[in-house]
Amino acid sequence: MTDVDDITTARRWIILGCSLLAALTTTCVVSGVAYLIPTLHTDAGLTLTQASALAAIPTVGLMAATIPWGILLDRYGERRILLLSLSISLAGATGAAVAASADASYAVVGAALFVGGLGSGAANGASGRIVVGWFPAHQRGTAMGIRQMAQPLGIGVCALTMPVVAASSGPAAALAIPAVVTAAGLVAVVVGITDPPRRPAPASTVGNPPPRTNPYRDNSFLARIHIVSMLLVIPQSMLWTFVPTWLIVAHGWSPAGAGTLITVTQIIGALGRIVAGRWSDAWMSRMRPVRVIAVAGVAAMSALAIADWFDSPLAPALMAVASVISVADNGLAFTAIAEYVGPEWSGRGLAVQNTGQYLVSAATTPLLGALIATVGFPIAFAATALAPLVATPLVPRDRMREPDELVDA
Protein backbone atom coordinates (compact mmCIF):
# COMPACT_ATOMS: atom_id res chain seq x y z
CA MET A 1 0.00 0.00 0.00
CA THR A 2 1.28 3.46 -0.88
CA ASP A 3 2.56 5.48 2.09
CA VAL A 4 1.30 9.02 2.61
CA ASP A 5 4.84 10.45 2.53
CA ASP A 6 5.51 8.81 -0.85
CA ILE A 7 2.55 10.31 -2.68
CA THR A 8 2.59 13.69 -4.40
CA THR A 9 -0.05 16.37 -4.09
CA ALA A 10 -0.93 15.92 -7.76
CA ARG A 11 -1.43 12.20 -7.21
CA ARG A 12 -3.89 12.89 -4.38
CA TRP A 13 -6.01 15.02 -6.66
CA ILE A 14 -5.84 12.43 -9.44
CA ILE A 15 -7.12 9.79 -7.01
CA LEU A 16 -9.92 12.15 -6.03
CA GLY A 17 -10.78 12.77 -9.69
CA CYS A 18 -11.00 9.04 -10.38
CA SER A 19 -13.22 8.66 -7.31
CA LEU A 20 -15.42 11.43 -8.70
CA LEU A 21 -15.79 9.61 -12.02
CA ALA A 22 -16.60 6.35 -10.24
CA ALA A 23 -19.30 8.11 -8.22
CA LEU A 24 -20.65 9.78 -11.36
CA THR A 25 -21.54 6.31 -12.66
CA THR A 26 -23.86 5.84 -9.69
CA THR A 27 -25.74 9.02 -10.54
CA CYS A 28 -26.15 8.05 -14.19
CA VAL A 29 -27.30 4.49 -13.45
CA VAL A 30 -29.63 5.46 -10.61
CA SER A 31 -30.98 8.84 -11.77
CA GLY A 32 -30.73 8.60 -15.54
CA VAL A 33 -34.05 6.81 -16.03
CA ALA A 34 -35.84 9.89 -14.67
CA TYR A 35 -34.93 11.68 -17.91
CA LEU A 36 -36.95 9.14 -19.85
CA ILE A 37 -40.14 9.94 -17.91
CA PRO A 38 -41.42 12.43 -20.54
CA THR A 39 -40.90 9.90 -23.36
CA LEU A 40 -42.34 7.03 -21.34
CA HIS A 41 -45.33 9.21 -20.43
CA THR A 42 -46.12 10.75 -23.82
CA ASP A 43 -44.90 8.08 -26.26
CA ALA A 44 -44.93 4.76 -24.39
CA GLY A 45 -48.32 5.24 -22.78
CA LEU A 46 -47.25 5.01 -19.14
CA THR A 47 -48.94 7.24 -16.60
CA LEU A 48 -46.75 9.72 -14.77
CA THR A 49 -47.01 7.56 -11.64
CA GLN A 50 -46.00 4.39 -13.54
CA ALA A 51 -43.07 6.08 -15.25
CA SER A 52 -41.95 7.54 -11.91
CA ALA A 53 -42.12 4.09 -10.31
CA LEU A 54 -39.92 2.63 -13.07
CA ALA A 55 -37.44 5.48 -12.58
CA ALA A 56 -37.28 4.69 -8.85
CA ILE A 57 -36.31 1.01 -9.31
CA PRO A 58 -32.53 1.58 -9.51
CA THR A 59 -32.76 3.61 -6.32
CA VAL A 60 -34.40 0.66 -4.56
CA GLY A 61 -31.52 -1.60 -5.61
CA LEU A 62 -28.96 0.96 -4.52
CA MET A 63 -30.61 1.44 -1.17
CA ALA A 64 -30.75 -2.31 -0.52
CA ALA A 65 -27.02 -2.79 -1.08
CA THR A 66 -25.35 0.41 0.13
CA ILE A 67 -24.77 -0.64 3.76
CA PRO A 68 -23.34 -4.08 2.83
CA TRP A 69 -21.04 -2.33 0.36
CA GLY A 70 -19.98 0.06 3.14
CA ILE A 71 -19.02 -2.83 5.40
CA LEU A 72 -16.96 -4.36 2.60
CA LEU A 73 -15.27 -1.02 1.89
CA ASP A 74 -14.20 -0.67 5.52
CA ARG A 75 -12.86 -4.22 5.58
CA TYR A 76 -11.20 -4.66 2.18
CA GLY A 77 -10.46 -1.14 0.96
CA GLU A 78 -11.83 0.86 -1.90
CA ARG A 79 -10.02 -0.27 -5.02
CA ARG A 80 -11.04 -3.95 -4.92
CA ILE A 81 -14.62 -3.26 -3.87
CA LEU A 82 -15.11 -0.56 -6.51
CA LEU A 83 -13.87 -2.92 -9.20
CA LEU A 84 -16.43 -5.52 -8.12
CA SER A 85 -19.34 -3.13 -7.62
CA LEU A 86 -18.90 -1.21 -10.86
CA SER A 87 -18.66 -4.48 -12.78
CA ILE A 88 -22.06 -5.47 -11.38
CA SER A 89 -23.46 -2.02 -12.15
CA LEU A 90 -22.15 -2.22 -15.71
CA ALA A 91 -23.82 -5.60 -16.19
CA GLY A 92 -27.16 -4.23 -14.97
CA ALA A 93 -27.01 -1.04 -17.04
CA THR A 94 -26.05 -2.97 -20.16
CA GLY A 95 -28.77 -5.53 -19.50
CA ALA A 96 -31.42 -2.80 -19.24
CA ALA A 97 -30.38 -1.31 -22.59
CA VAL A 98 -30.33 -4.72 -24.28
CA ALA A 99 -33.70 -5.71 -22.79
CA ALA A 100 -35.31 -2.46 -23.91
CA SER A 101 -33.89 -2.80 -27.42
CA ALA A 102 -35.34 -6.32 -27.60
CA ASP A 103 -38.79 -4.98 -26.63
CA ALA A 104 -38.75 -6.98 -23.41
CA SER A 105 -41.41 -6.26 -20.81
CA TYR A 106 -41.00 -3.43 -18.35
CA ALA A 107 -40.60 -6.09 -15.65
CA VAL A 108 -37.45 -7.38 -17.35
CA VAL A 109 -36.11 -3.88 -17.89
CA GLY A 110 -36.89 -3.07 -14.27
CA ALA A 111 -35.06 -6.19 -13.06
CA ALA A 112 -31.94 -5.14 -14.97
CA LEU A 113 -32.22 -1.62 -13.58
CA PHE A 114 -32.46 -3.13 -10.10
CA VAL A 115 -29.20 -5.03 -10.66
CA GLY A 116 -27.57 -1.83 -11.86
CA GLY A 117 -28.70 -0.13 -8.68
CA LEU A 118 -27.37 -2.97 -6.53
CA GLY A 119 -23.90 -2.50 -7.97
CA SER A 120 -23.89 1.27 -7.63
CA GLY A 121 -23.77 1.56 -3.85
CA ALA A 122 -20.03 1.23 -3.23
CA ALA A 123 -18.94 4.29 -5.20
CA ASN A 124 -20.95 6.65 -2.98
CA GLY A 125 -19.43 5.39 0.26
CA ALA A 126 -15.90 5.08 -1.05
CA SER A 127 -14.98 8.76 -0.92
CA GLY A 128 -14.82 9.08 2.86
CA ARG A 129 -11.62 7.09 3.28
CA ILE A 130 -10.02 8.80 0.28
CA VAL A 131 -10.77 12.30 1.57
CA VAL A 132 -9.85 11.64 5.21
CA GLY A 133 -6.91 9.42 4.30
CA TRP A 134 -5.26 11.54 1.62
CA PHE A 135 -6.16 15.14 2.56
CA PRO A 136 -5.45 17.34 5.60
CA ALA A 137 -8.38 18.73 7.59
CA HIS A 138 -8.18 22.23 6.13
CA GLN A 139 -8.60 20.82 2.61
CA ARG A 140 -11.23 18.17 3.26
CA GLY A 141 -14.26 20.39 2.76
CA THR A 142 -12.93 21.46 -0.62
CA ALA A 143 -11.89 17.91 -1.53
CA MET A 144 -15.28 16.48 -0.62
CA GLY A 145 -16.98 19.33 -2.46
CA ILE A 146 -15.07 18.34 -5.59
CA ARG A 147 -15.89 14.67 -5.05
CA GLN A 148 -19.56 15.54 -4.54
CA MET A 149 -19.62 17.25 -7.92
CA ALA A 150 -20.31 13.74 -9.20
CA GLN A 151 -24.04 13.99 -8.58
CA PRO A 152 -24.82 17.25 -10.40
CA LEU A 153 -22.34 16.46 -13.16
CA GLY A 154 -23.92 13.04 -13.63
CA ILE A 155 -27.34 14.64 -13.74
CA GLY A 156 -26.01 17.12 -16.28
CA VAL A 157 -24.69 14.34 -18.51
CA CYS A 158 -28.03 12.53 -18.37
CA ALA A 159 -30.09 15.69 -18.87
CA LEU A 160 -28.06 16.77 -21.88
CA THR A 161 -28.10 13.40 -23.63
CA MET A 162 -30.87 11.03 -22.56
CA PRO A 163 -34.01 13.07 -23.43
CA VAL A 164 -32.59 13.97 -26.83
CA VAL A 165 -31.53 10.40 -27.63
CA ALA A 166 -34.86 9.05 -26.36
CA ALA A 167 -36.80 11.50 -28.54
CA SER A 168 -34.80 10.66 -31.66
CA SER A 169 -33.92 6.98 -31.22
CA GLY A 170 -36.12 5.68 -28.42
CA PRO A 171 -35.64 4.82 -24.73
CA ALA A 172 -33.49 1.76 -25.46
CA ALA A 173 -30.78 3.86 -27.09
CA ALA A 174 -30.91 6.34 -24.21
CA LEU A 175 -30.43 3.52 -21.68
CA ALA A 176 -27.05 2.78 -23.27
CA ILE A 177 -25.69 6.09 -21.96
CA PRO A 178 -25.42 5.02 -18.28
CA ALA A 179 -23.69 1.82 -19.44
CA VAL A 180 -21.07 3.79 -21.36
CA VAL A 181 -20.45 6.11 -18.40
CA THR A 182 -20.11 3.13 -16.06
CA ALA A 183 -17.54 1.53 -18.34
CA ALA A 184 -15.50 4.75 -18.22
CA GLY A 185 -15.76 4.80 -14.42
CA LEU A 186 -14.53 1.22 -14.21
CA VAL A 187 -11.47 2.13 -16.27
CA ALA A 188 -10.80 5.10 -13.95
CA VAL A 189 -10.80 2.79 -10.92
CA VAL A 190 -8.38 0.39 -12.62
CA VAL A 191 -6.00 3.16 -13.61
CA GLY A 192 -6.26 5.72 -10.83
CA ILE A 193 -7.57 4.57 -7.44
CA THR A 194 -5.04 3.85 -4.67
CA ASP A 195 -6.16 3.00 -1.15
CA PRO A 196 -4.86 5.34 1.58
CA PRO A 197 -2.90 3.78 4.46
CA ARG A 198 -4.82 2.76 7.51
CA ARG A 199 -4.41 4.86 10.61
CA PRO A 200 -1.64 3.42 12.82
CA ALA A 201 -2.47 2.46 16.39
CA PRO A 202 -1.03 4.71 19.12
CA ALA A 203 2.32 3.50 20.48
CA SER A 204 0.85 2.82 23.91
CA THR A 205 -1.68 0.38 22.47
CA VAL A 206 0.49 -1.49 19.94
CA GLY A 207 0.20 -5.20 20.62
CA ASN A 208 -2.97 -4.70 22.61
CA PRO A 209 -5.13 -2.23 20.64
CA PRO A 210 -8.47 -1.17 22.11
CA PRO A 211 -11.59 -2.32 20.31
CA ARG A 212 -13.01 0.11 17.79
CA THR A 213 -16.12 1.62 19.30
CA ASN A 214 -19.30 2.26 17.37
CA PRO A 215 -19.42 6.05 16.77
CA TYR A 216 -23.21 5.93 16.66
CA ARG A 217 -23.29 5.11 20.38
CA ASP A 218 -21.49 8.26 21.46
CA ASN A 219 -24.24 10.86 20.93
CA SER A 220 -26.93 11.97 18.48
CA PHE A 221 -24.60 13.89 16.14
CA LEU A 222 -24.56 11.32 13.33
CA ALA A 223 -28.26 10.53 13.64
CA ARG A 224 -29.17 14.20 13.34
CA ILE A 225 -26.97 14.66 10.28
CA HIS A 226 -28.67 11.68 8.65
CA ILE A 227 -32.15 13.01 9.43
CA VAL A 228 -31.33 16.52 8.20
CA SER A 229 -29.84 15.13 5.00
CA MET A 230 -32.88 12.94 4.40
CA LEU A 231 -35.09 16.01 4.62
CA LEU A 232 -32.86 18.20 2.47
CA VAL A 233 -32.66 15.58 -0.28
CA ILE A 234 -36.41 15.86 -0.95
CA PRO A 235 -36.20 19.16 -2.91
CA GLN A 236 -33.11 17.88 -4.72
CA SER A 237 -34.80 14.62 -5.70
CA MET A 238 -37.98 16.39 -6.74
CA LEU A 239 -36.16 18.85 -8.98
CA TRP A 240 -33.84 16.27 -10.50
CA THR A 241 -36.70 13.89 -11.28
CA PHE A 242 -39.57 16.11 -12.41
CA VAL A 243 -38.03 19.27 -13.87
CA PRO A 244 -37.60 17.66 -17.31
CA THR A 245 -41.32 16.83 -17.34
CA TRP A 246 -42.14 20.29 -15.96
CA LEU A 247 -40.21 22.01 -18.73
CA ILE A 248 -41.13 19.70 -21.63
CA VAL A 249 -44.73 18.74 -20.85
CA ALA A 250 -46.02 21.61 -18.71
CA HIS A 251 -44.15 24.48 -20.37
CA GLY A 252 -43.63 23.20 -23.91
CA TRP A 253 -39.84 23.27 -23.97
CA SER A 254 -37.99 21.09 -26.47
CA PRO A 255 -35.99 18.16 -25.04
CA ALA A 256 -32.78 19.81 -26.24
CA GLY A 257 -33.66 23.16 -24.64
CA ALA A 258 -34.69 21.56 -21.36
CA GLY A 259 -31.56 19.41 -21.32
CA THR A 260 -29.34 22.41 -21.92
CA LEU A 261 -30.90 24.43 -19.09
CA ILE A 262 -30.67 21.50 -16.69
CA THR A 263 -27.07 20.79 -17.65
CA VAL A 264 -26.02 24.41 -17.11
CA THR A 265 -27.84 24.37 -13.78
CA GLN A 266 -26.11 21.18 -12.69
CA ILE A 267 -22.68 22.51 -13.67
CA ILE A 268 -23.33 25.59 -11.54
CA GLY A 269 -24.55 23.30 -8.75
CA ALA A 270 -21.37 21.25 -9.01
CA LEU A 271 -19.26 24.39 -8.68
CA GLY A 272 -21.51 25.43 -5.79
CA ARG A 273 -20.49 22.30 -3.90
CA ILE A 274 -16.85 23.33 -4.18
CA VAL A 275 -17.74 26.82 -2.95
CA ALA A 276 -19.65 25.30 -0.02
CA GLY A 277 -16.65 23.13 0.81
CA ARG A 278 -14.28 26.11 0.74
CA TRP A 279 -16.78 28.03 2.84
CA SER A 280 -16.79 25.28 5.47
CA ASP A 281 -12.98 25.14 5.46
CA ALA A 282 -12.82 28.91 6.00
CA TRP A 283 -15.37 28.78 8.82
CA MET A 284 -13.82 25.57 10.22
CA SER A 285 -17.42 24.38 10.47
CA ARG A 286 -19.48 21.93 8.43
CA MET A 287 -22.85 22.43 10.14
CA ARG A 288 -23.24 26.20 10.19
CA PRO A 289 -23.20 26.40 6.38
CA VAL A 290 -25.72 23.54 6.26
CA ARG A 291 -28.10 25.57 8.41
CA VAL A 292 -27.79 28.59 6.10
CA ILE A 293 -28.36 26.39 3.05
CA ALA A 294 -31.51 24.89 4.59
CA VAL A 295 -33.00 28.35 5.15
CA ALA A 296 -32.11 29.35 1.60
CA GLY A 297 -33.79 26.16 0.35
CA VAL A 298 -37.08 27.12 1.99
CA ALA A 299 -36.98 30.54 0.34
CA ALA A 300 -36.04 29.19 -3.09
CA MET A 301 -38.69 26.46 -3.26
CA SER A 302 -41.36 28.84 -1.99
CA ALA A 303 -40.43 31.43 -4.60
CA LEU A 304 -40.53 28.78 -7.33
CA ALA A 305 -43.99 27.66 -6.23
CA ILE A 306 -45.34 31.22 -6.31
CA ALA A 307 -43.75 32.00 -9.68
CA ASP A 308 -45.10 28.82 -11.26
CA TRP A 309 -48.57 29.42 -9.82
CA PHE A 310 -48.72 32.78 -11.59
CA ASP A 311 -47.03 31.45 -14.77
CA SER A 312 -44.18 33.89 -14.29
CA PRO A 313 -41.40 33.87 -16.90
CA LEU A 314 -39.01 33.93 -13.95
CA ALA A 315 -39.99 30.38 -12.97
CA PRO A 316 -37.22 28.60 -14.95
CA ALA A 317 -34.59 30.91 -13.47
CA LEU A 318 -35.94 30.32 -9.97
CA MET A 319 -35.89 26.59 -10.67
CA ALA A 320 -32.19 26.90 -11.50
CA VAL A 321 -31.52 28.78 -8.26
CA ALA A 322 -33.45 26.22 -6.21
CA SER A 323 -31.57 23.37 -7.90
CA VAL A 324 -28.18 24.89 -7.09
CA ILE A 325 -29.16 25.44 -3.45
CA SER A 326 -30.64 21.95 -3.11
CA VAL A 327 -27.31 20.24 -3.87
CA ALA A 328 -25.00 22.51 -1.86
CA ASP A 329 -25.26 20.70 1.49
CA ASN A 330 -24.32 17.17 0.45
CA GLY A 331 -20.55 17.50 0.56
CA LEU A 332 -20.65 19.23 3.94
CA ALA A 333 -22.64 16.42 5.54
CA PHE A 334 -20.38 13.79 3.98
CA THR A 335 -17.26 15.56 5.22
CA ALA A 336 -18.64 15.91 8.74
CA ILE A 337 -19.52 12.22 8.87
CA ALA A 338 -16.17 11.05 7.47
CA GLU A 339 -14.22 13.27 9.88
CA TYR A 340 -16.24 12.21 12.88
CA VAL A 341 -16.18 8.44 12.31
CA GLY A 342 -12.66 8.23 10.88
CA PRO A 343 -11.38 6.00 8.04
CA GLU A 344 -12.25 2.78 9.87
CA TRP A 345 -15.97 3.61 9.85
CA SER A 346 -16.27 5.92 6.85
CA GLY A 347 -17.66 3.24 4.54
CA ARG A 348 -20.44 2.36 6.96
CA GLY A 349 -21.11 5.95 8.00
CA LEU A 350 -21.50 7.17 4.44
CA ALA A 351 -23.44 4.03 3.55
CA VAL A 352 -26.02 4.85 6.21
CA GLN A 353 -26.10 8.44 4.94
CA ASN A 354 -26.66 7.33 1.36
CA THR A 355 -29.21 4.69 2.28
CA GLY A 356 -31.31 7.21 4.18
CA GLN A 357 -31.23 9.70 1.33
CA TYR A 358 -32.01 7.14 -1.34
CA LEU A 359 -34.76 5.62 0.79
CA VAL A 360 -36.43 9.02 0.96
CA SER A 361 -35.90 9.58 -2.77
CA ALA A 362 -37.38 6.20 -3.67
CA ALA A 363 -40.36 6.72 -1.38
CA THR A 364 -41.13 10.30 -2.39
CA THR A 365 -40.69 9.99 -6.17
CA PRO A 366 -43.97 8.11 -6.82
CA LEU A 367 -45.74 10.19 -4.18
CA LEU A 368 -44.62 13.44 -5.76
CA GLY A 369 -45.58 12.11 -9.19
CA ALA A 370 -49.07 11.38 -7.90
CA LEU A 371 -49.23 14.79 -6.18
CA ILE A 372 -48.24 16.58 -9.40
CA ALA A 373 -50.81 14.62 -11.39
CA THR A 374 -53.50 15.54 -8.84
CA VAL A 375 -52.85 19.19 -7.92
CA GLY A 376 -50.13 20.37 -10.31
CA PHE A 377 -46.54 21.50 -10.04
CA PRO A 378 -46.96 24.74 -8.01
CA ILE A 379 -48.56 22.98 -5.03
CA ALA A 380 -45.96 20.21 -5.25
CA PHE A 381 -43.15 22.78 -5.17
CA ALA A 382 -44.74 24.43 -2.13
CA ALA A 383 -45.11 21.09 -0.34
CA THR A 384 -41.46 20.32 -1.03
CA ALA A 385 -40.42 23.57 0.67
CA LEU A 386 -41.64 22.11 3.97
CA ALA A 387 -38.74 19.64 4.07
CA PRO A 388 -35.90 22.17 4.54
CA LEU A 389 -38.15 24.12 6.89
CA VAL A 390 -38.38 21.10 9.20
CA ALA A 391 -34.66 20.36 8.77
CA THR A 392 -33.37 23.77 9.84
CA PRO A 393 -33.77 23.45 13.64
CA LEU A 394 -32.50 19.86 13.55
CA VAL A 395 -29.03 20.72 12.21
CA PRO A 396 -26.58 19.75 15.00
CA ARG A 397 -23.65 21.75 16.25
CA ASP A 398 -20.22 20.80 14.98
CA ARG A 399 -18.35 18.12 16.88
CA MET A 400 -14.67 18.55 17.70
CA ARG A 401 -12.34 16.95 15.20
CA GLU A 402 -9.68 14.46 16.15
CA PRO A 403 -6.34 16.25 16.52
CA ASP A 404 -4.23 13.74 14.57
CA GLU A 405 -3.71 14.06 10.84
CA LEU A 406 -2.81 11.36 8.36
CA VAL A 407 -1.34 13.85 5.91
CA ASP A 408 0.57 17.08 6.01
CA ALA A 409 -0.64 20.30 4.51
Where are these regions (language model features)?
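Extracytoplasmic gate region of multi-pass secondary transporters
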Residues: 33-34, 221-263, 270
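Cytoplasmic membrane-interface "Motif A"-like loop-to-helix N-cap segments
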Residues: 75-86, 282-295
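C-terminal ends and interior cores of transmembrane alpha-helices
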Residues: 87-102, 296-309
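Cytoplasmic helix-loop-helix junction between adjacent transmembrane helices
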Residues: 112-151
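Helix-loop-helix hairpin linking two adjacent transmembrane segments in secondary transporters
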Residues: 147-195
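Flexible cytoplasmic inter-helical loops of multi-pass small-molecule transporters
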Residues: 190-214, 403-409
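C-terminal transmembrane helical hairpin of 12-TM major facilitator-type secondary transporters
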Residues: 287-333
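A late C-terminal transmembrane helix in Major Facilitator Superfamily
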Residues: 340-374
